[in-house]
Amino acid sequence: LETLQQADVVVSEDTRKTGFLLNHFEIKKPQISFREDNEQRVLPKLMEELNSGRNIALVTDAGTPAISDPGFILVRAALAENIPVTAVPGPTALIMAVILSGLPVHSFTFRGFGPRKHGPRKRWLAIDVASPHTLIFYESPHRLIAFLEDALEVYGDRQAAVANDLTKKFETVLRGSLSELLAQFKENPPLGEYSVVIAGAGEKDLDNSDEED
């Protein structure tokens, strides 16, 4: 709250959502929308604000700014011009999802959102097919089933978890094999944004070696 109160401008994807937050805490600040479809047009204006000495608070609609978020473009541009940037720690879906998944958390890879079409998505997933690290993805509700189908085809029937509405009233984490999770979502259509956590390659072999030790 102190950061928002001290900022000269508040930047977010959806100023309506951020407006609810600001109004709730009676913080009156000018807002600028910075989205994937306007970032190249709005970025020069934001850089002008920063170069004039004004402070910008970057807020995300959900999660953490710059992670699977257009705010990354602004952060990179500011750093390129030696403008100081700091971050306010807060919850992020990928960390909560991997912790609650029940899968190994000592080493993991975050992939974020993948391609929308089957062919490119399967090739993108295949990049990590031999990786021993737990894999974390983000996916939208209307592509989740297709994503799980492609993941099952590429990775085989690995253990996985699908998390939704983390930190909210109806927080849900489903755990099981990819085929089991796929069946659940085919029966109960997905709603909301999802974090998908998939076991890395060779987890069973690692478990067996631990038992022998």
Task: Please provide the spans of the model-predicted regions.
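Alpha-helix capping/helix-boundary segments
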Residues: 16-18, 63-64, 93, 143, ...
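Short active-site oxyanion
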Residues: 4-10, 82-86, 133-135
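Class I SAM-dependent methyltransferase SAM-binding "motif I" and its flanking Rossmann-like core
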Residues: 73-131
